[in-house]
């Protein structure tokens, strides 16, 4: 393993840090002609690292020096003199070439392994980060959930379903509204980007899906969805802000969402319906998956109670906690309607639910969304009542 460096090259270790090239030349020059003296110095401080390489013109002279000078004292320190080995040159702080060499490779390995580890984690973080960036800190609180979400997103709408479930869990697990919102944001955020042009469309069709998918999510994470109520408001904030940033916010104010804080509060969103539609859009975002999710979820929802939970979570999304009771009832009814629709088929919910989101998004700045959102939710409510 240990390969001797070129003949005549000696490794001198254990040097006093004050020993310089001239001192080495004075000591070793007595044995023969020296071709090169390489004193290893610290790059930053430029101080001696305690070892050097002295190359003699004649290998025989080098052997004599190694025999005579090894273990001798130089400038108050016992030095080690031996045939230089290639590895020792690179990492020979200790002195003996072999030890440094062994040391060096491990370092490299560590570095490599660390690097490999680092990059992957970084990659993950990147994903999270990227998402988080989009989601506004979603990564920081729930990077993992976010991760789950984003990949599905990129994967496609169906994955989004999984994403919502992930986020919901994350929110519940996180125990913080923000996480959920972020997780959702992450979902909402990327979906926004992807569907931006077709947001409305997405909302229209995804709504039903969103319900169903969300239902599926909620069914999976009903608890979390309930938790999401708390978290939900923040998601809304994000969605509001993110979705329509200026326009949606404006709409909200006009609607009575007035308070962006209201986003945080979401309670003041008396226009739960619109909130619902947003939620729907949320859901649609989360589940761009549309119809398929609806199929699965209705059975799982099976009971209106889930919807209630769901609706409550939606309320969370809607964020109108204050109007939970009223909005919930509306939402419940609407949810039930949707459930019924889903059970019957997506079209009903699509008709009722989709238009409101469209209005919101398309005319969020106008304030028409209010009416649209409310109307949509109302229709849902009406539908829900009929079903009930």
From Swiss-Prot:
Residue ranges constituting the RRM domain according to the UniProt record: 8-86
Compositional bias segments (type: Pro residues): 148-161
Sites of the Glycyl lysine isopeptide (Lys-Gly) (interchain with G-Cter in SUMO2) crosslink: 80
UniProt cross-references to InterPro entries, sorted A to Z: Nucleotide-bd_a/b_plait_sf, RBD_domain_sf, RBM, RBM1CTR, RRM_dom, RRM_dom_euk
Record field: compositional bias (Basic and acidic residues): 61-80, 191-212, 238-271, 333-344, 377-388
Modified residues annotated as Phosphoserine in this record: 88
Gene Ontology biological-process entries: mRNA processing; positive regulation of mRNA splicing, via spliceosome; RNA splicing
Low complexity bias (residue ranges): 320-332
CDD domains: RRM_RBMX_like
SUPFAM superfamilies found in the cross-reference section: RNA-binding domain, RBD
GO molecular function (one): RNA binding
Places the protein is found: Nucleus
Alphabetic keyword roster: Isopeptide bond, mRNA processing, mRNA splicing, Nucleus, Phosphoprotein, Ribonucleoprotein, RNA-binding, Ubl conjugation
A Pfam family of this chain: RRM_1
Listed name of the protein: RNA binding motif protein, X-linked-like-1
Species of the source: Rattus norvegicus (Rat)
Gene: Rbmxl1
């Amino acid at each position: 393993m240990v390969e001797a460096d070129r003949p005549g090259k000696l490794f001198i270790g254990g040097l006093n840090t004050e020993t310089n090239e001239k001192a080495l030349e004075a000591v070793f020059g007595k044995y023969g002609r020296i071709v090169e003296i390489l004193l290893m110095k610290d790059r930053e401080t430029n101080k001696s690292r305690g070892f050097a390489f002295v190359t003699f013109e004649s290998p025989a002279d080098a052997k004599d020096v190694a025999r005579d000078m090894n273990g001798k004292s130089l400038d108050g320190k016992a030095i080690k003199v031996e045939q230089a080995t290639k590895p020792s040159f690179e990492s020979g702080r200790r002195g003996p070439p072999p030890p440094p060499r062994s040391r060096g490779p491990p370092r490299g390995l560590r570095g490599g392994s660390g690097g490999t580890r680092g990059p992957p984690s970084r990659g993950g973080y990147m994903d999270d980060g990227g998402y988080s960036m989009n989601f506004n800190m979603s990564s920081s609180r729930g990077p993992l959930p976010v991760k789950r979400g984003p990949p599905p997103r990129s994967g496609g709408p169906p994955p989004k379903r999984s994403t919502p479930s992930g986020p919901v869990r994350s929110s519940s697990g996180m125990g913080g509204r923000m996480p959920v919102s972020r997780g959702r944001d992450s979902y909402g955020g990327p979906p926004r980007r992807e569907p931006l042009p077709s947001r409305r469309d997405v909302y229209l069709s995804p709504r039903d899906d969103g319900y169903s998918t969300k239902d599926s999510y909620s069914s999976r994470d009903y608890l979390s969805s309930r938790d999401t109520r708390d978290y939900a408001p923040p998601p809304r904030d994000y969605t509001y802000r993110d979705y329509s940033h200026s326009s949606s916010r404006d709409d909200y104010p006009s609607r009575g969402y007035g308070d962006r804080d209201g986003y945080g509060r979401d309670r003041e969103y008396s226009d739960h319906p619109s909130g619902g539609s947003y939620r729907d859009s949320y859901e649609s975002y989360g589940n761009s998956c549309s119809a398929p999710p609806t199929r699965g979820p209705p059975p799982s929802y099976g009971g209106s109670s889930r919807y209630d939970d769901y609706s409550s979570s939606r309320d969370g999304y809607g964020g109108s906690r204050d109007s939970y009771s009223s909005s919930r009832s509306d939402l419940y009814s609407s949810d039930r309607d949707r459930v019924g629709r889903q059970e019957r088929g997506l079209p009903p919910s699509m008709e009722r639910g989709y238009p409101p989101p469209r209005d919101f998004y398309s005319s969020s700045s106008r304030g028409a969304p209010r009416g649209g959102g409310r109307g949509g939710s109302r229709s849902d409510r009406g539908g829900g009542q009929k079903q009930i």
